[in-house]
Every structure is written in structure tokens, then in C-alpha cells.
Amino acid sequence: MTKKVMDEQESHKEYLDEILQAGEVQEDTVPLVEWSQGQSSPEGECTEARIAELETELARQKEQAGKYRDELLRRAADFENFRKQKEREAMMASSRALENIIRELLPVIDDVKRLLDHAPLSAERSSEARPYIEGVEMVKKNLEKWLDEKGVKAIASIGTMLDVNFHEAISQIDSPDAEPDMIVDEYQTGYLLGERVIRHAKVIVAR
């Protein structure tokens, strides 16, 4: 074999080696180029899926928390309404009970007032009658004080015009000095409990 042939073979071998080496480099670099063009790694795909799963779960938990909050507010409002209703019912029951007591007590007060209206004047009282009359006056004073503490007020009558919301006319008389329907006398005192009439005043009015 001549030197020329050997040189050509050697050159050809080197050329083949270069081609093979170039092929190995291209084979190794192609996946890297493709990876950089948007392919995701398995680890990245797993992380993104987990994040999406957690976000979905967080949204569900927020929605559930909102429902619990709305339910809690509704129950709190229901309880507050129930409490206020019971307070109103208790106040109304207490007011009705007080009103019933006052209604039963008013005839006693009427009798005490009539007794004192017909009692002798202080200067005319005998030594025997004076202690009893003074005792009745003390009872009347205490009863009126108790009524005042409970918010009970007597209805103004004499000298005012008849008002059917507060007065009940039981008689009419001629009275030159009074206008028609003006109250000139009171037969029975009327009372208010707060702003509610618990007994109308029975009055006599001018024609």
C-alpha cells in the first residue's frame, strides 16, 4: 500500500470521526433546545397541579366559611329578636299586672277621699276623732305617693273642656260662667298609667 493511499484512508477515517462526533453533539443538544422551547419537566407539572388543587380547595373553604358566617349572623339576629321579644313580653306582663293592682286599689282610694271630704274640718274635730282622721289622711298620702312612684297621674278635669279620650260625662247642668261642655265638677277622679288611661274621669259638664 502506497503512502498516498494510506494518507487518504487516514483522512477518510478522521472525516468519519468528525461526522460521528458531530452527530453525538447534535443528538445531545436537540432535547436541550426542545426543552427550552416550552416543554415542562415532570416536577414542574406536578407542582402546578398541586398549586391548582390547593387554590381550588382554598376557594371551597372560603365559600364554606362565608356560609358559616352568614348562618352565624342569622342565628345571632334571631336570638337578638327573640331576646327583645321576651323583654317586651315581660314588660307588658309586668305592666298589665301593675295596672290590675292599680285598678283594684282605686276604689279604696275613692273611699278614703270621700271619707275625708265628709270629715269635720281640723278645727272642728273632737279630740277622739282627730287621731282617726289624721290616720286616714296619712293613708291617703301614702297611697298617692305609691301611685306617683308607679307613674300613675290623676287626669285633670275641672275647668277643662270635655275630652272623651279622658273624661266620661255623667251629667249636664246649667252654668252661666262656663262654656258648653266645660267640666264644672268631678264625680270620680280618672287616672293615667304613663300615657294610657286606666280609668276615665267621671265628670259633670255645663250645657
Curated annotation (Swiss-Prot):
Protein family membership: Belongs to the GrpE family.
SUPFAM superfamilies: Coiled-coil domain of nucleotide exchange factor GrpE, Head domain of nucleotide exchange factor GrpE
Function: Participates actively in the response to hyperosmotic and heat shock by preventing the aggregation of stress-denatured proteins, in association with DnaK and GrpE. It is the nucleotide exchange factor for DnaK and may function as a thermosensor. Unfolded proteins bind initially to DnaJ; upon interaction with the DnaJ-bound protein, DnaK hydrolyzes its bound ATP, resulting in the formation of a stable complex. GrpE releases ADP from DnaK; ATP binding to DnaK triggers the release of the substrate protein, thus completing the reaction cycle.
Gene Ontology terms: cellular component: cytoplasm
Protein origin, superkingdom: Bacteria
Name used for this protein in its record: Protein GrpE
Chief location category: cytoplasm
Entry-linked Pfam families: GrpE (PF01025)
Subunit architecture: Homodimer.
Keywords for this protein: Chaperone, Cytoplasm, Stress response
